[in-house]
C-alpha cells in the first residue's frame, strides 16, 4: 500500500 502517485485515485 503505497500512494506515491495517485494511480488508484487520480487527482483531477
From Swiss-Prot:
GO terms for cellular component: extracellular region. Signal peptide: none annotated. Coiled coil: none annotated. Expressed in the brain, subesophageal ganglion and in the retrocerebral complex (mainly corpora cardiaca). Mediates visceral muscle contractile activity (myotropic activity). Belongs to the pyrokinin family. This is Pyrokinin-4. It comes from Celatoblatta sp. (strain Blue Mountains).
Amino acid at each position: 500500500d503505497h500512494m506515491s502517485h495517485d494511480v488508484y485515485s487520480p487527482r483531477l
